[in-house]
Each structure stands twice: as C-alpha cells, then as structure tokens.
Amino acid sequence: MSQKKIAVVAVGGNALIRSRDAVSLDAQYQAVKETAHHVVALIEAGWRVVLTHGNGPQVGFILRRSEIARDDVPVVPLEYAVGDTQGAIGFMFQNALYNELQRRGISDTPVSALVTQTLIDPNDPAFDAPDKPIGAHMDREVAEKLAASQGWKIADDAGRGWRRVVASPKPLQIIESPVIRRLLEENVLVVACGGGGIPVYRNQDGTLSAAQAVIDKDRASALLAQELNADMLLIPTGVEQVAIDFGTPEQRWLDTLTCEQAQALLDSGEFGAGSMAPKVEAIVGWLRHAPGKTGIITSPEAMGDAVAGRKGTRITD
C-alpha cells in the first residue's frame, strides 16, 4: 500500500437522525452531508479513509413498513433489510462525499460504497439472548403493545426510550476486506460494513448463507481495522469526549485513556451498555491486536481537531 495512513471512521446510525422529528430521508441526507464535510477534511489531511456506518433506526423502519404491508407484499427478512440499508445509506454517503470532494477540488479520490458481508458463528449464544436495538425509540406502552402483537423482544435503550432488540453475534471476519484493501490501494474513499455488515455463516461446502441477526457496527469496524492493519479507529458519537460519572455533578471529561484504564472502567460498569460501552470495548479490543495504534472517540464536528490531538478522547495501549 502507499504510505498514507489508514483511518476507519465508524459513524452510528443514530447520527443520521438528529431527533425524533428528523427521520425523513431528506433530513437524514442533511446529516450525512454534515458528516461528509468532516470526513473529507481527513482526506485533505492525508488519510486514506474507510467509512463504516450503523443502521439501527433505518433497518427498523424497513421492517416496520414490511410488517404493515405484509398482506400485500412479501415480508422483508432481517438480513435483506440490512442489505437494503447498506444500499440506501451507502448511496447517501457516496453522493455526499463525492460532492464534498468536488467542492474542495479533490479530483484524485473516487468514492465507492460496497455491500459487505460479515462472517459469524451460527451457534453464537447471542441468538439465545437478543440485545441489539433496532428501529425507532418508543415509549414503554407503545413498545409493549408492539411486542405483544408482533412477537418482538424489547428493551430500554440507555434511557432514551424503548426499542426492538434482535440477536447480535460476534463478527469473526469481514468477507470483503481484501476488496476494501485493493480499493484503498487505488486511493478510493470506501464506504463499507454498513450496519456492521450482512451476517453470514459458512456452510460445510464453503458457501455462505445469511443469518437472521445484526452485527454491532463498532465491533465490525474494529475487526475491519484489524484486518486492514489500520492506523486509527475513529468513532464519532453524540459527545465530544468520553466522560466518567456522566450526567452527575461529578462528571469529568477524559482527554486520554490507556487500554488498562478503559478496561477497568468497563469492568466497573462506568459506561452505559447501549451508548459508550460498545465504542470503548471496540477500541480496546482492536488495540490488543494493534499495539502502537490510536483509537479516538469524539463528536463528528470535532473529528479534525481530535485527530490533531486538540479534542476528543484518545485511547492508546
């Protein structure tokens, strides 16, 4: 590969939906445009970028529409809904990134969104204990009614409302990582691993079959960073830094963490299971395989300053 460093940037599906009143595709595209502005700044700074994205709200919308229309059209299976979101969100990012590159006069960086599969174990215990939120936030009464009528599993999503939950097995391999590597060699800005990738398992004859599940975007992004030997894993989120005692008078923002410190905070239950914990876990897990590399958690608008060491929380081994 060329000497440019590789950054995997993992954008959450909720980052596309800024509020419960901003769920239209036009509103989501506006959010994508804002993120694209900050991602292209990394390109200008000399990074090669793979952008991954979540899809929790969006895949839930597809499934809900499918359930409403089930008497008229075939129901969309979960794995196909994940594929649908990879296409739709991938298009939004591909278009917005291309336009931002054009506006900045950067003509040597093509953009490509790649449908991506993620290998899982079909016997993963996650299938017996679904816990990955998808779809819109609801109040408890609405969620319980849908759980009763649709056979859903539901859970509180870090105090932000109730959501449907599905199985989220551990990602074992990003099937298309060799393709992503080749694209990076050609200086392509790649959009991949949408929604963590479409979960697939390997049959005895080597073929792949889809699984009814979703993959955690941060864990899949960490695995992709490992397979690409990336130099940085950057996870934009709703706050500029990681905090301890979040939401209390003792709240304290953290500029830096070592893996050991981060793991101790995870073990103590310091971070919310559905919010900051998966991001910190993903970076710590990646750094165990990537000594000397850097993980960063920050807000989208602070990404450039965070990479330069001026903002965000930097996690190192």
Question: Model segments located where?
Answer:
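C-terminal catalytic "cap/lid" subdomain
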Residues: 2-317
